């Protein structure tokens, strides 16, 4: 009996032969940064820390960023388990369908296994480049620079949009407003067009319109820089 006990006892004592599947795999990306222009914080879309592969239109991983309490507050963000097919780490505006809207910052990723530690500095959310990408390029060029001509004599293609808007009189403004007057949202006809013009006011859903107007207002109040 004692021999049988030893036989079965040894047969059942396999020890711990399975790997611990709770251990993280992949690299970690740590990013330190701060934001200004918080008025332009996305409402419809999401500001996120992202990992992108070869396809730049859709991220492999995202970590949504929480809005800080004030401009300039230093944040430290982390993206865990960065996969080997990652080609860049980016701070970007992402749609709810997880499509890239606009990237504020990008850093290439090499093939090593070392952790990524990135110091980004300060990002201005109310940037003209984001307005160009998110608003003009996606919604306006068919009438203001595309094949059908220039509605309202306004050309907002990427290479001429800034010069077409800032401190330029809007021919359709009855009050004689500029399209954009730096620092003055009440004398910027671009906002009137998006808020009140029958052709344009329904271009976005409610939260999307709030996001676009806040973005443009924040940019104008910040001096309407070519940034």
Question: Model segments located where?
Answer:
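Sec-dependent bacterial lipoprotein signal peptides
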Residues: 1-11
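Aromatic- and Gly/Pro-enriched helix-to-coil junctions and flexible linker segments
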Residues: 12-73, 82-227
